[in-house]
Amino acid sequence: WCLGGFRLAFAIGAEPLIAALRQVKGVVDFNQSLALQQGAIQALTRWADWPRSLHGMYRERRDRVLSVLRGGGWSCPTPGMAMYVWLPLPADAGVRKLGDETFASHVLQRSGIALTPGSGFGEGGKGWLRMALVRPTDELEDAARRVVSAVP
Protein backbone atom coordinates (compact mmCIF):
# COMPACT_ATOMS: atom_id res chain seq x y z
CA TRP A 1 0.00 0.00 0.00
CA CYS A 2 3.10 2.22 -0.21
CA LEU A 3 2.91 3.08 3.49
CA GLY A 4 6.35 1.75 4.45
CA GLY A 5 7.78 5.10 5.50
CA PHE A 6 4.94 5.68 7.92
CA ARG A 7 6.02 2.78 10.17
CA LEU A 8 2.51 1.57 10.86
CA ALA A 9 2.14 -1.64 12.82
CA PHE A 10 0.29 -3.19 15.70
CA ALA A 11 1.38 -5.28 18.63
CA ILE A 12 -0.39 -7.82 20.79
CA GLY A 13 1.15 -8.94 24.03
CA ALA A 14 1.24 -8.88 27.79
CA GLU A 15 0.28 -5.50 29.25
CA PRO A 16 3.76 -4.81 30.76
CA LEU A 17 5.37 -5.36 27.34
CA ILE A 18 2.83 -3.17 25.55
CA ALA A 19 3.33 -0.44 28.18
CA ALA A 20 7.10 -0.56 27.61
CA LEU A 21 6.56 -0.44 23.85
CA ARG A 22 4.36 2.65 24.25
CA GLN A 23 7.13 4.39 26.17
CA VAL A 24 9.71 3.65 23.50
CA LYS A 25 7.40 4.59 20.62
CA GLY A 26 6.49 7.87 22.29
CA VAL A 27 10.14 8.90 22.38
CA VAL A 28 11.34 7.39 19.12
CA ASP A 29 8.71 8.33 16.56
CA PHE A 30 5.89 10.03 18.44
CA ASN A 31 3.37 7.42 17.28
CA GLN A 32 1.13 7.93 14.27
CA SER A 33 -1.88 10.17 13.81
CA LEU A 34 -5.35 8.69 14.06
CA ALA A 35 -6.05 9.84 10.48
CA LEU A 36 -3.08 7.85 9.17
CA GLN A 37 -4.11 4.81 11.19
CA GLN A 38 -7.66 5.03 9.82
CA GLY A 39 -6.31 5.37 6.28
CA ALA A 40 -4.21 2.25 6.74
CA ILE A 41 -7.23 0.34 8.07
CA GLN A 42 -9.19 1.36 4.96
CA ALA A 43 -6.32 0.24 2.72
CA LEU A 44 -6.14 -3.14 4.43
CA THR A 45 -9.88 -3.76 4.39
CA ARG A 46 -10.95 -2.24 1.07
CA TRP A 47 -7.97 -2.87 -1.17
CA ALA A 48 -6.55 -6.16 0.07
CA ASP A 49 -5.59 -7.27 -3.46
CA TRP A 50 -4.00 -3.99 -4.51
CA PRO A 51 -0.41 -4.93 -3.53
CA ARG A 52 -0.57 -7.89 -5.93
CA SER A 53 -1.24 -5.46 -8.76
CA LEU A 54 2.00 -3.68 -7.90
CA HIS A 55 4.14 -6.82 -8.18
CA GLY A 56 4.08 -6.86 -11.96
CA MET A 57 4.87 -3.16 -12.19
CA TYR A 58 7.85 -3.39 -9.82
CA ARG A 59 9.07 -6.62 -11.45
CA GLU A 60 9.11 -4.88 -14.85
CA ARG A 61 10.91 -1.85 -13.44
CA ARG A 62 13.46 -4.06 -11.67
CA ASP A 63 14.11 -6.20 -14.73
CA ARG A 64 14.49 -3.29 -17.14
CA VAL A 65 16.79 -1.34 -14.81
CA LEU A 66 18.95 -4.40 -14.14
CA SER A 67 19.13 -5.11 -17.87
CA VAL A 68 20.52 -1.63 -18.54
CA LEU A 69 22.95 -1.78 -15.62
CA ARG A 70 24.19 -5.27 -16.48
CA GLY A 71 24.54 -4.27 -20.11
CA GLY A 72 26.81 -1.48 -18.87
CA GLY A 73 29.04 -3.86 -16.95
CA TRP A 74 27.47 -3.77 -13.48
CA SER A 75 27.12 -7.07 -11.64
CA CYS A 76 23.84 -6.74 -9.74
CA PRO A 77 21.87 -9.33 -7.79
CA THR A 78 18.18 -9.72 -8.62
CA PRO A 79 15.99 -9.00 -5.59
CA GLY A 80 12.91 -11.17 -5.10
CA MET A 81 10.62 -8.19 -4.81
CA ALA A 82 11.31 -4.69 -3.58
CA MET A 83 10.89 -1.04 -4.43
CA TYR A 84 14.65 -0.76 -5.00
CA VAL A 85 17.69 -2.63 -6.27
CA TRP A 86 21.07 -2.94 -4.59
CA LEU A 87 24.14 -2.24 -6.70
CA PRO A 88 27.62 -3.33 -5.63
CA LEU A 89 30.29 -0.76 -6.36
CA PRO A 90 31.92 -1.48 -9.72
CA ALA A 91 34.86 -3.87 -9.52
CA ASP A 92 37.35 -1.17 -10.60
CA ALA A 93 39.88 -0.85 -7.77
CA GLY A 94 39.84 2.94 -7.94
CA VAL A 95 36.07 3.04 -7.55
CA ARG A 96 36.08 0.55 -4.68
CA LYS A 97 38.74 2.64 -2.95
CA LEU A 98 36.44 5.68 -3.08
CA GLY A 99 33.77 3.93 -1.03
CA ASP A 100 30.01 4.05 -1.48
CA GLU A 101 29.44 7.57 -0.12
CA THR A 102 32.05 9.26 -2.31
CA PHE A 103 31.07 7.22 -5.35
CA ALA A 104 27.37 8.04 -4.88
CA SER A 105 28.34 11.72 -4.78
CA HIS A 106 30.40 11.24 -7.95
CA VAL A 107 27.45 9.61 -9.73
CA LEU A 108 25.14 12.44 -8.63
CA GLN A 109 27.54 15.11 -9.89
CA ARG A 110 28.15 13.39 -13.23
CA SER A 111 24.66 12.09 -13.97
CA GLY A 112 22.17 13.96 -11.80
CA ILE A 113 20.99 10.61 -10.40
CA ALA A 114 20.90 10.16 -6.63
CA LEU A 115 21.83 6.71 -5.35
CA THR A 116 21.73 5.99 -1.63
CA PRO A 117 25.06 4.86 -0.15
CA GLY A 118 24.62 1.47 1.45
CA SER A 119 26.78 2.41 4.43
CA GLY A 120 23.86 4.55 5.61
CA PHE A 121 22.08 1.27 6.38
CA GLY A 122 24.89 -0.10 8.54
CA GLU A 123 28.15 -1.96 8.23
CA GLY A 124 26.72 -4.60 5.88
CA GLY A 125 25.77 -1.91 3.37
CA LYS A 126 29.31 -0.65 2.82
CA GLY A 127 30.35 -1.01 -0.79
CA TRP A 128 26.76 -0.98 -2.05
CA LEU A 129 24.37 1.59 -3.51
CA ARG A 130 20.58 1.52 -3.41
CA MET A 131 18.52 2.67 -6.38
CA ALA A 132 14.81 3.29 -5.79
CA LEU A 133 12.30 2.03 -8.37
CA VAL A 134 9.63 4.60 -7.59
CA ARG A 135 9.61 6.51 -10.87
CA PRO A 136 7.98 5.46 -14.17
CA THR A 137 9.81 2.66 -15.98
CA ASP A 138 11.09 4.78 -18.88
CA GLU A 139 12.55 7.33 -16.45
CA LEU A 140 14.23 4.53 -14.51
CA GLU A 141 15.80 3.09 -17.66
CA ASP A 142 17.14 6.54 -18.52
CA ALA A 143 18.46 6.92 -14.97
CA ALA A 144 20.20 3.54 -15.21
CA ARG A 145 21.84 4.59 -18.51
CA ARG A 146 23.04 7.78 -16.86
CA VAL A 147 24.44 5.84 -13.90
CA VAL A 148 26.32 3.55 -16.30
CA SER A 149 27.75 6.56 -18.14
CA ALA A 150 28.92 8.11 -14.85
CA VAL A 151 31.33 5.27 -14.08
CA PRO A 152 34.89 6.39 -14.87
Whereabouts are the PLM-identified features?
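PLP-dependent class I/II
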Residues: 1-152
